Amino acid sequence: MDIPIFGVNVPAPPIRIKKELLEEYARLYKGIRNREDTVSWRTLIITCRKILGVADPDYKPVRKSKLTQSKKLVTFLIKKTYLEPLFFEIMYALGFRGIKTKKKADLDYLLFSGKHHPEPLLWNLADYLKEKSKSVAVINPIGHYNDGQTRVVGPSVVFMKINKVVILTSTQSKFGGSVSVLSNVIRLLRNPKFAQKVKEVDIVIPMFGGSRGHRLGQSEDVGFEVMEAAFNAKLISLPAEDLQKKLSKEINNLPKFRFFSLDIHNSLYPNKIFKDEGFDFISVDPTGEIVKDIIKYLHRCRVQSVPVKVVACDTGAVPRTENFAKNLLGLLGSKNKELQVICIEKKRPQAGIVSSVKISKIEEWKREGGKIVKSRMRIPKKSSLKESILIYSDDMIDTGGTAEKDLNYLSGVYPNCIMKIFVATHPVLSRGLSAFKRIGADVYFVGNSLSIEGLSEQANVQLVDLAPSICDAIEK
């Protein structure tokens, strides 16, 4: 076994450790700080017990005589991390009781990873909350048994009141998510010693898997399709409902459960299912953060005074596009007090197939005395030679086929467009990063709701951090 070189990536331990355990100490120190593969709660406790001389750490606590060494080790390991607020919970898990302390301050947020390998968005949310002077702790409760089965372990007790527990998760196996894993993480609240300290539980699923996959009009002869957006909502609701029933017999103040997702414009699923089960479901609007980043980009490129045209890709996209335009117009500045909203109409002989594209409506929006004045514009019969910036907004970017047709058509109508911007909340990209080349926009503003390998390295892609939007929704 190699002995780590301390001082390079890992500082020397604060206590004397057996030579054969030095590598485990080094792995633990780095694992606590590794945001891509964060050490689980159970691994943290078991490894600390081993380092502190426990031969059988699954069954035996640390000896009382090791209290001083334990304090030094734990304090050193979790210093300047999101485990620091959980010092006494960690000491309790090591086996120590009755450690003298002042009354612990309430914790604003306890964040749980609800999927294999914590999402970058989890850490962005923690960092953003910390910047807002909130007290924040983060736990990865997900590990594995020897046979690979998921093992979910959280603190057995907490010593402070917790305003909000936030579980950031995914329902998609491709991204390390699972309805089953999420259900088990929710069941950590089955522990009454934990649940009685929690005021609210917010379960955040940035992109609700299956909510955009089924297309109306598909051939029913292919087979009976389970509607995952509806069924998954029911599956996720059940453990929360079951917890509340059982906890109601054990504790007085039950935590409130709420569910969140980003940019859901389907009013039926999964919203109706959650509400039928008695839970609030909130679709988080990410427009504010996306618009802020676009405005910064336009200023960097010194084109903030060029007329802007915002495009609704189809009839169903009109409400979200108008919301986008309203936010954008409010931030464009004094040199650009107006923009145009263009509505596209498509003919679809069948789901996923577009036979024709045309402009159905154009409105000019002006800011006048704090109000937006809208006026109908003529649809150009000839190509417009005026300079403009086109912003094409959609809820997601996948293969890029439809957007390619739309932008080709719009480029013909507005040949002097100096910049084409594509905006999407969710980077699905089921056929890879080639979608960007296919669409042909100059720059893409894409939300970080899904972790796509290589996305952040794309030169013409601006990743928009959606953590502030999530935080604002949770805070309301």
Question: What spans do the regions from the language model cover?
Answer:
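PRPP-associated nucleotide enzymes
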Residues: 1-476
